[in-house]
Amino acid sequence: MSDNIENPTILFETSWEVCNKVGGIYTVLSTKAKVLSKQFGDKLIFVGPDVWSDENPSPFFKESKTLLKEWKQNAILPEGISVRIGKWSIPGNPIAILVKFDSLYAKKDYFYAYMWDRFKVDSLHAYGDYDEGCAFALAAAMVIKSCSSYLAKRNDKIIAHFNEWTTGMGLLYIKAQAPDIATVFTTHATSIGRSICGNNKPLYDYFSHYNGDQMAAELNMQSKHSLEKAAAHNADCFTTVSKITADECEQLLEIRPL
């Protein structure tokens, strides 16, 4: 588990923005991919959502019929979860697995109940893109669990790195179902911090007086906030991208990133 944090040999990195350019996280991931590719080679695998079609393909993904072919042919995944494997067209040209996750919508009540019982994640107040993010995260985690079993040799140390609240439920799934895989969680900005600013409240003027749980209830952000907080507290390693965001996490999530 946490021993795998040091000198890992296999790295899975999951984000909604793998091969899916939405915002700044895409830039963060694509910038570091070249360095990680030199370190891990074909043991670096990015996992992203398959939100594409033949009519609207990803301009950043080149599918391969040979990469991880044996695993794909023999992978045991829940019905409806499918993958496409290829290369992400960024510096380093890393392997990417795109995951089709729509089938998990029908099972969301089961998973939400499980996450409440195990980690006290409150999905009762979910709305908007919460279901989409969680379905993807769970499917990605199932893929990571399956693929890591195929790739790993006896002495391999595996890390699964999850970015943002949208992948938090995947981290919790790995924590519960594949505890030998070390987990890293990175937030690029807290969901409740974004909501405070989005509601025209002065985040930094009254920063030390904000309580994340209280503000989540006030702004109807309980689900995203509780998921993000649970992921941060349960990860083997919690990180962020700047000191100011680390301060935000410490105040609103009640845990200081490394």
Regions found by a protein language model. Give the residues of each.
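Catalytic cores of nucleotide-sugar-dependent glycosyltransferases that transfer UDP/GDP/TDP-activated
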Residues: 1-258
